[in-house]
Amino acid sequence: MAWTPLLLLLLSHCTGSLSQPVLTQPPSSSASPGESARLTCTLPSDINVGSYNIYWYQQKPGSPPRYLLYYYSDSDKGQGSGVPSRFSGSKDASANTGILLISGLQSEDEADYYCMIWPSNAS
């Protein structure tokens, strides 16, 4: 049986932090159920991803955004209540990017995904 591609829509720009930088996200990403999706959130060059928590939210039509997780480092991260462990965060310092990885995609994962940054207390 062929799977219908699962389309993960991403907001192309969203703002966060005190100075309201523009965070860049690709306009969309698609994958099939059971596969993994890697969603990115690229910070402007004058802001170092290493100094910020990256927050991720999921929004489905007609519903408010749902907090998924935040990621600062492997030892400083947090999962939202009821959010499955197949949602995980990371960073790519060389690309100045925050990453949301969704493994074992399910049809219910079809949604808009938003990133937000906030300065870390650890920095």
From Swiss-Prot:
Primary localization class, coarse: secreted
Framework-1: region residues: 20-44
Pfam families noted in UniProt: V-set
Ig-like domain ranges (all copies): 21-123
GO cellular component terms given for this protein: extracellular region; immunoglobulin complex; plasma membrane
UniProt entry keywords in alphabetical sequence: Adaptive immunity, Cell membrane, Disulfide bond, Immunity, Immunoglobulin, Immunoglobulin domain, Membrane, Secreted, Signal
Compartments (UniProt record): Secreted; Cell membrane
Spans annotated as Complementarity-determining-2: 71-77
Signal peptide: 1-19
UniProt key word Secreted: yes
Described purpose of this protein according to its UniProt entry: V region of the variable domain of immunoglobulin light chains that participates in the antigen recognition. Immunoglobulins, also known as antibodies, are membrane-bound or secreted glycoproteins produced by B lymphocytes. In the recognition phase of humoral immunity, the membrane-bound immunoglobulins serve as receptors which, upon binding of a specific antigen, trigger the clonal expansion and differentiation of B lymphocytes into immunoglobulins-secreting plasma cells.
Quaternary state and interactors: Immunoglobulins are composed of two identical heavy chains and two identical light chains; disulfide-linked.
UniProt protein name: Immunoglobulin lambda variable 5-37
Gene from which the chain derives: IGLV5-37
